[in-house]
Amino acid sequence: MNFTPTERERYSRQIQLPGFGEEGQKRLKDSTAVVTGVGGLGGTVALYLAAAGVGKIILVRGGDLRLDDLNRQILMTNSWVGQPRVYKAKETLLNLNPEIEVEAVSEFVTAENIDALVQQADIAFDCAFDFKERNLLNQACVRWGVPMVEAAMSGMDAYLTSIIPGETPCLSCIFPETPQWDRWGFGVLGAVSGSLACLAALEGIKLLTGLGEPLTGQLLTMDLGTATFAKRRPYHDPNCPVCGDFTKQRLSSYIRRQEAEGRSQESGVRSQK
């Protein structure tokens, strides 16, 4: 894929990076990322993906912008309060980088919409505000073999990991029981969610381009109040209901059935012509 003169100039500083180059930039341009949540985490992730030149970004978030969102949601403006936040996010990203494509989905993640969203993506970023949506994204990414960058924070604490289906523990392995999570029950400082979001965006760029060493199979925990960072390897549960061995067998059978049904439908269409 050739770059336009504008693209070459726009991305010239990162193309200079050892191990990145034009090949890394091409991989970003050819990639589609889905970001669930467009808040202090997801919005900032999307900002740096857009700046880096990820070819298509799908933003998924229902609901309107609230005044108390503005301490951390840097894609928004005060004048947008009361309106669907995902559309303002799209506008801001395209103003930053009109060379990319941005799709705005003003919906919350549900069992009905998540598969269609994930199937379009080369990578997913889990920045949703509750674990119901996070678990749905995790399950879909495992089903369809899509890498997922998992990022979450509460107060001054945060964690980050990369989940590669079939290789690493999934979110259900890390949290076999859903954590108690009240979206209004903890304070949030914009600089904390922003710091985590920058690391999450970088993690995704690493996975897409091969730059550096991503956190595959490692969980990075952060206490940003004391600048304390630690890494550990979470347990990969062979009996996990989402990614365990038996689940993989069921998934393989499911995909084969889906492919067979697709071929049958195509055959039926041809026979009607």
Pin down the residues of each PLM region.
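Serine residues within intrinsically disordered or low-complexity segments
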Residues: 264-267, 271
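Adenine nucleotide-associated cytosolic modules
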Residues: 1-261, 273
